[in-house]
A protein has these predicted regions:
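Conserved catalytic or regulatory cores that recognize and/or transform ribose-phosphate-containing ligands
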Residues: 1-85, 89-190
Length: 190
């Protein structure tokens, strides 16, 4: 699959082993990275080339890579505006997006702002190095045939149809979305 993988460069040296582990695993599993930036960025940091005069070019490459991707994976242990913006772009483009962070994030509340995003395309996972590949595999496998849509006819009794009509009118949500959300809840439960 075509995957856009990114992470923050804010603490690059501290987390580069993890970033490269994710990148290398995706490549090893024969996925195509729509933007393979880690090696180049690591070299720039190592050489002390911190003057980013080409930031508009980098931004446009990131946007293009998100557009070309089938899936987006963002390592967000070090949250910042950049990763948050890329999460938003991916979700606006309706790209299935996995947001990862290692260990417990420093926060006062048990949920963060990102947990308030109501999107069927967003998955958030806390990982340890021992289960990182499993989390990534589960995410990729879930969306392996994501673009293969199947039409399905459903027979409802009048009571069920009335309920769907009522929810559609009162909550401004399509009947299809209501049914898909109920199915997703059941899938997640099982």
């Amino acid at each position: 699959m075509k995957i856009y993988f990114t992470a923050s460069t804010a603490e690059f040296n501290k987390y580069k082993k993890t970033y490269f582990a994710i990148r290398d695993y995706l490549v090893q599993e024969n996925h195509t990275l729509t933007r393979d930036w880690l090696k180049h960025t690591g070299e720039r940091i190592k050489e002390g080339d911190l003057n980013v005069s080409d930031i508009k070019k980098i931004y446009n490459k990131c946007v293009l890579a998100i557009n070309q991707a089938q899936l987006v994976i963002i390592e967000d242990t070090v949250s910042n505006f950049s990763t948050g913006h890329q999460i938003t772009l991916a979700l606006q483009k309706q790209k299935p997006t996995l947001v990862l962070w290692q260990g417990k994030k420093h926060r006062y509340f048990n949920q963060m702002f990102i947990h308030g995003i109501d999107s069927e395309h967003l998955e958030i996972a806390q990982y340890k190095p021992t289960n990182l590949e499993t989390i990534i595999n589960t995410f990729i496998n879930k969306y392996q045939d994501y673009n293969n849509k199947t039409r399905f006819n459903l027979v409802l009794n009048q009571y069920e149809r009335n309920y769907l009509d009522w929810v559609q009118f009162n909550r401004a949500t399509s009947r299809t979305k209501i049914i898909k959300n109920a199915l997703k809840e059941k899938i997640d439960e099982d």
